[in-house]
Amino acid sequence: MPTVNQLIRKPRTAPVKRNKVPALQANPQKRGVCTRVYTTTPKKPNSALRKVAKVRLTNGFEVIGYIPGEGHNLQEHSVVMIRGGRVKDLPGVRYHIIRGVLDTQGVKNRKQRRSKYGAKRPK
């Protein structure tokens, strides 16, 4: 416990908050164009081919976005919407591509958690 004199000499400093999604620039989502769509492998101990896309945003940032769900229709020059949210086992992937918005189609035959994957209600 510091004394009053110690606090006068060197006041308490608040910890510096680091922005986890700098490319969004305090916006909830950003639009961008896919420059490369590819698969990558996760860190140990996981094993898969995760679908990701490199996206050039409208503000000039170039980020890597994860494509959630089974199957996708994205290719180079597809216009996509990006939201924050990292993928824990993919280093450098700090954004998610939103399904069912702009050029990204929703997941086919999705029955549960449809809103997360842009799927319409089945008849």
From Swiss-Prot:
UniProt keyword annotations, A-Z: Methylation, Ribonucleoprotein, Ribosomal protein, RNA-binding, rRNA-binding, tRNA-binding
Keyword Ribonucleoprotein recorded: yes
Span of the signal peptide: none
Residues carrying 3-methylthioaspartic acid: 89
Pfam family, one: Ribosom_S12_S23
Ribosomal protein among keywords: yes
Record text on subunit structure and interactions: Part of the 30S ribosomal subunit. Contacts proteins S8 and S17. May interact with IF1 in the 30S initiation complex.
Identification of the protein by name: Small ribosomal subunit protein uS12
Purpose of the protein: With S4 and S5 plays an important role in translational accuracy. Interacts with and stabilizes bases of the 16S rRNA that are involved in tRNA selection in the A site and with the mRNA backbone. Located at the interface of the 30S and 50S subunits, it traverses the body of the 30S subunit contacting proteins on the other side and probably holding the rRNA structure together. The combined cluster of proteins S8, S12 and S17 appears to hold together the shoulder and platform of the 30S subunit.
Effect of residue 91 to L: In strain: Rev.1; induces streptomycin resistance in this live attenuated vaccine strain
One of the GO biological process terms: translation
NCBIfam families assigned to the protein according to its UniProt record, in alphabetical order: rpsL_bact
PROSITE patterns per UniProt: RIBOSOMAL_S12
Example GO molecular function: structural constituent of ribosome
Family to which the UniProt record says this protein belongs: Belongs to the universal ribosomal protein uS12 family.
